[in-house]
Amino acid sequence: MRIMGLDVGDKTIGVAISDLSGTIAQGLTTIKRSSNKKDFERIKQIINEYEVGMIIVGLPKNMNGTLGPQGQKVMRFVEHLKEAFSIPIILWDERLTTVEAQRVLIEKADISRAKRKEVIDKLAAVLILQNYLDSQKNK
């Protein structure tokens, strides 16, 4: 079974997918947001194409663990996602994943600012999903 990771933002949704063994996450695409209906159609295509059995959605929290405005938006998105799909959907603490993704792209990949904007959400989705996959190995 493959697992999908989502980094949900106001303008884009970063998408990552696991390998069949649930060990490694890789970036798949970035969905440009338009409406929940269209976003969900694209997510459904990916679920069907990759035979996804679970979705991990990054939940942005403040450093003190509370939910800010973006976290509340993601919670609403996930409520609709659960209504649209009958597979397990898990919220995963994504604190600092976007910061880490930016650091990786600057320090390790030496990618320009314009190019970073294109891939940052996809990389954040990879980090969210990989953190989840790693946590499951230890169980």
Curated annotation (Swiss-Prot):
A GO MF term: nuclease activity
Record-linked SMART domains: YqgFc (SM00732)
The enzyme's E.C. designation: 3.1.-.-
Main location: cytoplasm
Keyword Hydrolase: yes
Stated role: Could be a nuclease involved in processing of the 5'-end of pre-16S rRNA.
PANTHER family: POLYNUCLEOTIDYL TRANSFERASE, RIBONUCLEASE H-LIKE SUPERFAMILY PROTEIN (PTHR33317:SF4)
UniProt name for this protein: Putative pre-16S rRNA nuclease
